[in-house]
Each structure stands twice: as structure tokens, then as C-alpha cells.
UniProtKB/Swiss-Prot annotation:
GO terms for biological process: methylation; protein histidyl modification to diphthamide. It holds the Pfam family TP_methylase. It catalyses: 2-[(3S)-amino-3-carboxypropyl]-L-histidyl-[translation elongation factor 2] + 3 S-adenosyl-L-methionine = diphthine-[translation elongation factor 2] + 3 S-adenosyl-L-homocysteine + 3 H(+). Keywords: Methyltransferase, S-adenosyl-L-methionine, Transferase. The keyword ATP-binding does not apply. This is Diphthine synthase. The gene is dphB. SUPFAM superfamilies: Tetrapyrrole methylase. GO terms for molecular function: diphthine synthase activity. It comes from Methanosphaera stadtmanae (strain ATCC 43021 / DSM 3091 / JCM 11832 / MCB-3). It is an enzyme of class 2 (transferase). Belongs to the diphthine synthase family. The lineage of its organism: Archaea, Methanobacteriati, Methanobacteriota, Methanomada group, Methanobacteria. Its EC number is 2.1.1.98. HAMAP family: Diphthine_synth.
Amino acid sequence: MLYFIGLGLFSEDDISYKGFKALKSVDCIYAEFYTAKLMGGNIDNLIEKLDVPFITLKREDVEDANVIIKEAMTKDIAFVTAGDSLMATTHTELYVEAINKGIKTQIIHGSSIFSAAPGISGLQAYKFGKTTTVPFPDENFFPHSPYDAIKLNSQMGLHTLVLLDIQAHKDRYMTVNQALDYLSKVESERKEHVFDDDRIVIGIAQAGSKHPIVKGGRVSDVKNFDFGKPLHCIIVPANLHFIEAEALITLADVDKELLKDFL
């Protein structure tokens, strides 16, 4: 048996009761924290409560998947991730391979940024388009794909959830400020008015915590806001329903004057 279990957004306390019971029942737990990480707690606290062998995998271990598949053929195994299960391509590949090998599977979902970000900002979840990710740039690596996703979504009147790069093995997490600088640099190269300084954006930090940070405004203003500890993400709104506009004023501290065209 192979369980796919989402641990939730922020800390080890976010796991569902159903997920916790499943983890107590298995022979071994494999965890992956390179696509997302629980920033608000200590996973060791959960491990102590479970008293089950707990192995944290490297990226290449998940991409290979042979160890997990082989174990699940004869034992009850859990594959756990922060957030919701099966949100990454490599996780889906593992799920499909397990089914093709005749291994029994069960998915136990967890809270995710995909639902939390629209909720805490007051935006309607069904009005979001393609999600994109801003990566850490390198000497020969500066993709424009996040800019293109925002452009395409905006043309269709859809909001964009922008995830920010995570390099957990280096303890390196992109901030809202870094991502806005990245997108502004693309704008300076492309000059297509997709991400001008007066574009409204929403920065979010520590979603799932007791006191998440949600701050909106012009790009030029939000760039200078201190969002504190990671994890961070950004929403780039498109056309707003008046209820969404009212919510952004209250929930994201957006200046009412910036939203007057939607009220």
C-alpha cells in the first residue's frame, strides 16, 4: 500500500486527523521537502508522535522512485509532502507508476497555497489562470516564462498566482521583493506594459500561520514592504469583481483609490 499524504501549509500541526492516523499505521514514511517546506514548526515533533521510520528524500530519490515502489510492493508506505499531495509532476509520476505496478494507493489531501492564497486575499478562486513560478536567476538562466504567464492570464481577465523559488537544500527562499525585481527587470527588457510599476500586486507571506501577511498595492510600493519570514508568494490580479476589490481594501490593505474603477 502506498499513501500520498499532504502535511498542510505551515507546520506539523496542519496534517489532517485522517492523515495522522494513516501515518501511525504504516511501516515507513518517505518525505520530500524540496518543492515545499513546513516553515512554522519542527517536523521532528511529528516524527516523535508517530514512532515510525521517517526518511527524508533528495530530489533525485523521488525522480528515481525505485526505492519507494519496491518497498510499497510488500509494505505499507507513506509518501508525504508539505501542502497538498500530488501537486508536483514528480509526485504524479510516482502515483501513476504505483498504479501501473498494481500497488494499492490512497490519497489524503492537505491544505495548499493554491486554495489558501485566493482565500486570504479575498479573490475568487475560479478566476485564476495558469500558475507560474519565478526562479532564482543565474548567469545563463533568466527565463521570461513568469512574465508570459501573467501576460496571457491578464489578456483573459484572469488572476495569476506566482509561486517563488524554493531551494530548501540551500536554505534559500525567494522573497516577494526579489520576485518583483525579477519581473520588473523582464518588463524593462520587453517593454510590453505587462508589469509596469503601477501594476497592482498582492504579496503573501506565511500562509497557514496564525498571522499571515497579506499586502497589496502598486509594484513600486510593495517592492519596499518587509514581508518577513518565508514562504512567500504573489498574486497579480486582473479584472476585479467589486466584491474582490472591497476584499482587497480590507484584507490586503490596498489603497481604495487604486481600486476605484472596480467599485
